[in-house]
Every structure is written in structure tokens, then in C-alpha cells.
A protein has these predicted regions:
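Mid-domain catalytic core of redox enzymes
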Residues: 49, 292, 316-477, 622-633
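Active-site/ligand-binding neighborhood in enzyme catalytic cores
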Residues: 166, 170-321, 330
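Conserved Rossmann-like nucleotide-cofactor binding loop
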Residues: 38, 63, 354
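N-terminal mitochondrial targeting presequence
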Residues: 1-28, 633
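N-terminal Rossmann-like FAD-binding beta1-loop-alpha1 element of flavoenzymes
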Residues: 28-57
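Dinucleotide-binding Rossmann-like beta1-alpha1 core, especially the glycine-rich loop
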Residues: 76-179
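Conserved flavin/dinucleotide-binding core of flavoenzymes
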Residues: 29, 72, 137-139, 414, ...
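Glycine-rich FAD pyrophosphate-binding loop
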Residues: 47-74
Length: 633
């Protein structure tokens, strides 16, 4: 399949894609605490800074990659790939651009498998309600415009799941907006959706979506954090606001994405080569992407790149006992393990907030490192510790992977289905959250190479070819259970492997009529895997960031899925922000996006040069802006 042509203005050798100016800084060293995707990204980004002369990456377990864990399993006739964490990465520009650039830089450009928008995994997504699968209204490419409209209207009037949606949308504008005093006050997703639409939409539709992303309870999750752009439209009416945004081609852009793009130096921009441009064009035709060996292939490649850099000391199974700092401009950060204590100019902490709270709460005098003659007297950062204690809630999920040799096992094709909280216990005694049809998202297209189609140097066309994780036909399913339903569970309450597989098979038989027995089964209990952004989350992050900056003289940086997004793309962006602005880079004073000097990043609409993003949680004080889509970001 040919990849669309690329505008000449973006080809290599033309005007640089972006000009950025870095502040002049002295040489420095950094400790990165946590070897998940955020920490690996931060360490990789730091290796590109000539001023950063030493990086130490601490990871408490024996492996790197965090929740991104894949397993290749031999089966009769070939192999299949099971995922225990994220199984695909969402394609959404400009955020996904950073992932592509990093993957290209570490040698994965020919390994990326894109799930195309025309595939069933992109087109067909289901919700189980009340006792069958309901396809969410989405246009089908093979059908004409009128047939698609007819099908979607039919679903809205016939399906009990969707019936409350149309009147809720049509009459939403008649609901009173928040009072002026309430605009700064957060609320739960359940409260917001019920108030603006109706409780059925919250219970049947939105709760299912939040089960799929957060395994969370919409009575607790923050509306402003997770549905902010939608909530901000209620003064004019949400449906009207959506129509006007579509009419004016206005989109929401995260300001942090603009800052990540703006940081890239001249050498990095020139690295935006033909391969990367072709990958981006292919990505624009896709909905998600992954790798032949699963998503773990990305952190594995990052770890290899860190080892090759010669600047990174990777310490797995590191027993960190304390992170401390004696206030003062010239006082370093100290990381104490059972083996030694090292001083650093900056520490980037990407571990869970509760784990960080424990490390900051330990006085260096009480640790067991052998260097007893050089103990550091440091006052405990009580304000930071108190703020961190409010970040204490994450859900636990049981992930069950199943493989069946029968390729025609499923009654439908698609990405999978989610289960809303309105499903009674009799239909969902396993506390199921959803089922992923893994086979459907395990194949797609990858970049195949280019060929000349004309006499000029730039006259060539890239092509793609089919690609797949699995080398054998069959059906691969992932069943997710637990989440907020298991908040009250004790460790002894969680199911073991045999019980989890039995529960998963029982659920599949009830929902899909599958009675066949899987030939391969794997399960993994992911304890405290998904941090919950509960009501007031944004305010807590803001206050925590201020406190950390003050207590640690802007030398401690916080990043990871406890703060600014739980997705892989969110974590990669936080790693990039932490390794640049978090350690002292200044937002560039001149920014140009693309060959047109009139097209500038969203952050340039604000007084960005005054933003001090060093230390704490490095994120722009303005979170989201609206821009017309024809503005290059």
C-alpha cells in the first residue's frame, strides 16, 4: 500500500522544522528512579544532552519496562504474543509523534505495526448491555453515507444502551450551567454526566469507557481532569460546542505537547528524516500501533540504547532506602541504597507516589548503607510528604490471556467489548471490566521501503506491507477483571491462576457463548497498577509541584502515571518533559513550527518565557488550548 505523498516543505534538507534555543547550563548529573517507560524515556533523553555527563537509572526489580510486559509463547504451528500491560499505543498527533521519533532513533522504524483505520479493530468497539454486545455507532467504510446514517439512527432508537443518548444530547443545552462560583470546583464524572445528560448515559456508557481506561469508579474519578474540554463547553451547550468546533475545524491541543516539540534542538530536528515522515503518514491512516514482540519491545530497545550510550549506569534490583536533600542552592540530592550513597544535581522520580513517600520519609541517619562516616544530616520534607500522601489510590486488575486454535471462535470482529457498572452481578459475578480481542489488533501494516518514481532526488514513494505479531491462525483473548470492584479486597481475596482462568472462561461463555477450552492460558495480577485521578486531582498536582520545588530547591522532579496521564504516550511525554524542562531547560524564546513562520506552537499564545518548569511536576500552567486544525502544531 503506498503511503501518501509528503509536502516538499517537510522534506529533509528544507527549512528546519523547528528552531529552539536552550539556556546555557553547567555540566550536571542525574539519578532516574524507576525503570518503567517514563524513567527509560527520561534517561534516553538525557543522554542526548552534552551537559549531562552521568545518568544513573535505579530499578528495584530485575527487569526494566514497568507495566509494559509481553510474552512470546510457542503454540502448534507458530507463536503468539501475550500482553500483561498496555497492548497497543494510541495514534494521536502530536503526542504520538514523540513516540515515533524515539522509536525511529532507537532502531524500531521497521518494526512498528499500525492497525489501520479500515480494520475491524478500529471500526468495531462494543459495550455489553444488558445481555448482548452493542456496537458503538461508527461509520463503516464499505457502506455509503446514507446507509451509515440509517444504521446509526437505527441503533440510537433500537438499542436500550443508546436510546437515552439522543434525547440527552438534544436537550443538554436546556440544562443550567454551573454558577460562576462553581467553575473552579471539580466534580466526579458521574455527577457531571448525570447533571448535563442523564444518569443512564453515565451508568451505561461512560462507566464502561472508564472501566477500559482506568478500571475506575466514575463516582470518584475527576471530571475536570479526564473530561475537561467537554466540561468547559457547558456554558454554551456541549452539543452546540461540538458542532461549532467541527464547523470551524477547531481542536484541543495539550500545551505540554507543544513544549516537547519546542525543546528539540537543531540536530534533533534534522533527524526528522524521510523514514520518520513516511511513518507519520502511515500513522495518520491508523488508530493504534504496536510491535512484533509486543509493547515491551519499546522499553527493551530503550534499555539497549542506554547501554550503548556509555553515559548510563543501570542498576536493577536496587535497594533504595532514602532520597534526601539538605536545603541550599549548592546542596546536592542524595540517593541512598543498601550499598552506597551518591550525590546528584537532579533526581527524577518516576516511581509510584506511595513508594516515593516512603523514601522521602526516611532519615539518611537510619539507613543501612556502609558509608557510616559520611552521613548527611537532612531535615525531612514534611510538607512534600504530606502532599504526596493524598496520592494514595490505585486499582488492581487481573489480566487473563487465553489462546484458542479456532480462528473463527468469536461471533463478531472488533477491538473487544467493555462492561458498564450497570450490569447486575448475576451477569457479571466475576467483576469483569472488559474483553480484548487480541488477534484483531495484533496485525496491520508496517513500512516496507521506498522506490523512485521520478527523476528528482525527492521523487520516491514509500510503501507498506502486511505485518503481524502472531505467526499462526487462532483466537487470542484478554479478559480484564477487578479494578474498583476489588478496592476492598485483602491479598488473600484475589484469585489464583486457576481460579482466574475459570472465572474468565465462565464470563466468555455467558457473554459470547464460547464453550471451547483454551490451549494456552496465562494470568497476571497487576497490583495497584492504575492510579486513580479522583476529584480535585489537578489542584493536588499543582500544590504538590509547588511544595516539591520549594522543599528540594527545584532539584527533585516528579513524573509518571500518578500525575499527568496513565497512557504510554502520556508517560513518554512526562519523561521528555522531566529530562528537559524539569532539569532546567528554558522554553525557547523563538519558536517556529514548520516552514511557515506564521505557524507557531500553542504555548506561544501565552507568556511562556516566564514559566519556571524546573523541579516538581514539569507541566505548563495552561493545560489545554483550542486551535484551528490548519494551524501546524
Amino acid at each position: 500500500m503506498p503511503v501518501p505523498c509528503i509536502p516538499n516543505g517537510l522534506r529533509v534538507g528544507r527549512q528546519p522544522f523547528l528552531t529552539a534555543i536552550r539556556s546555557q547550563r553547567r555540566a550536571y548529573n542525574v539519578a532516574v528512579v524507576g525503570g518503567g517507560i517514563t524513567g527509560l524515556t527520561a534517561a534516553w533523553k538525557l543522554t542526548q544532552d552534552s551537559k549531562c555527563n552521568e545518568i544513573t537509572l535505579y530499578e528495584k526489580s530485575h527487569r526494566l519496562g514497568g507495566w509494559m510486559e509481553s510474552e512470546t509463547i510457542p503454540v502448534d504451528g507458530g507463536k503468539v504474543v501475550f500482553e500483561y500491560g498496555p497492548r497497543t499505543l494510541r495514534w494521536s498527533r502530536p503526542a504520538a509523534q514523540s513516540i515515533l521519533e524515539m522509536a525511529n532513533a532507537i532502531g524500531l522504524s521497521d518494526q512498528i505495526i499500525f492497525t489501520m483505520k479500515t480494520q475491524s479493530a478500529a471500526l468495531n468497539r462494543y459495550i455489553y448491555y444488558p445481555d448482548h454486545l452493542v456496537r458503538l455507532p461508527t461509520p463503516t467504510p464499505e457502506l455509503g453515507f446514507l446507509q451509515n446514517i440509517s444504521n446509526m439512527i437505527g441503533s440510537l432508537f433500537q438499542e436500550p444502551l443508546l436510546k437515552p443518548l439522543l434525547p440527552a444530547l438534544l436537550f443538554e443545552h436546556t440544562k443550567p450551567a454551573r454558577m460562576p462560583d462553581d467553575w473552579q470546583r471539580d466534580e466526579s464524572i458521574s455527577s457531571f454526566i448525570s447533571r448535563r445528560f442523564n444518569p443512564q448515559v453515565a451508568d451505561n456508557l461512560v462507566s464502561a469507557m472508564m472501566h477500559g481506561i482506568y478500571a475506575g469508579d466514575i463516582d470518584k474519578l475527576s471530571a475536570q481532569t479526564l473530561l475537561g474540554p467537554l466540561r468547559n463547553m457547558e456554558d454554551t451547550g456541549i452539543l452546540y460546542g461540538m458542532i461549532m468546533k467541527a464547523w470551524t475545524r477547531t481542536q484541543n491541543f495539550m500545551v505540554d505537547d507543544s513544549l516537547v516539540a519546542a525543546e528539540k534542538d537543531q540536530n534533533g530536528i534534522e533527524g526528522f528524516n524521510e523514514t520518520l515522515i513516511a511513518l507519520t503518514a502511515l500513522g495518520d491512516q491508523s488508530s493504534t500501533f504496536t510491535f512484533p514482540g509486543g509493547t515491551q519491545q519499546l522499553p527493551d530497545a530503550l534499555a539497549s540504547a542506554l547501554k550503548k550510550s556509555g553515559k548510563v549506569n543501570i542498576r536493577t534490583e536496587a535497594d533504595i532506602q532514602a532520597i534526601s536533600h539538605q536545603p541550599g542552592d549548592y546542596s546536592p540530592m542524595n540517593v541512598t541504597t543498601s550499598e552506597d550513597r551518591k550525590a546528584y544535581d537532579h533526581v527524577i522520580a518516576t516511581i509510584p507516589a506511595p513508594a516515593l513517600t516512603k523514601l522521602l520519609s526516611v532519615s539518611p541517619k537510619s539507613t543501612n548503607h556502609p558509608d557510616n562516616g559520611n552521613r548527611v544530616s537532612a531535615k525531612l520534607p514534611s510538607d512534600t510528604i504530606q502532599q504526596l500522601k493524598s496520592f494514595n489510590y490505585a486499582t488492581t486488575a487481573m489480566v487473563v490471556n487465553l489462546y484458542y486454535p479456532d480462528p473463527d471462535l468469536l461471533p463478531v470482529k472488533g477491538f473487544g467489548y467493555l462492561i458498564p457498572r450497570s450490569i447486575p452481578a448475576s451477569e457479571n459475578p466475576e467483576c469483569g471490566l472488559g474483553v480484548i480481542f487480541g488477534t484483531e489488533s495484533a496485525y496491520g501494516s508496517k513500512l516496507a521501503g521506498s522506490k523512485h518514481v521520478g527523476p528528482g532526488e525527492d521523487d520516491h514513494q514509500w510503501a507498506s506491507e502486511p505485518a503481524s505479531q502472531d505467526t499462526v491462525d487462532g483466537t487470542k483473548l484478554t479478559v480484564m477483571m477487578g479494578g474498583h470492584y476489588w478496592d476492598h479486597y485483602k491479598p488473600s481475596d484475589y484469585p489464583d491462576h486457576e481460579t482466574a482462568v475459570r472465572m474468565a472462561c465462565s464470563m466468555l461463555e455467558r457473554h459470547l457463548g464460547i464453550t471451547a477450552k483454551p490451549t494456552v492460558t496465562r494470568s497476571r495480577l497487576q497490583r495497584d497498577a492504575i492510579p486513580q485521578y479522583t476529584v480535585g486531582h489537578l489542584d493536588r498536582v499543582y500544590e504538590l509541584s509547588k511544595t516539591v520545588k520549594r522543599d528540594f530547591d527545584q532539584k527533585l522532579v516528579l513524573a509518571g502515571n500518578w500525575y499527568n496521564g496513565v497512557g504510554v504516550g502520556d508517560c513518554i511525554k512526562q519523561g521528555l518533559m522531566a529530562a528537559t524542562y524539569g532539569v532546567g531547560f528554558k522554553p525557547p524564546s523563538r519558536v517556529q513550527l514548520g516552514p511557515d513562520p506564521r505557524k507557531r506552537g500553542p504555548h506561544t499564545a501565552f507568556d511562556y518565557e516566564s514559566w519556571d518548569l524546573q523541579g516538581g511536576v514539569p507541566t505548563a500552567p495552561v493545560r489545554i488550548v483550542e486551535l484551528q486544525a490548519d494551524r501546524d502544531t
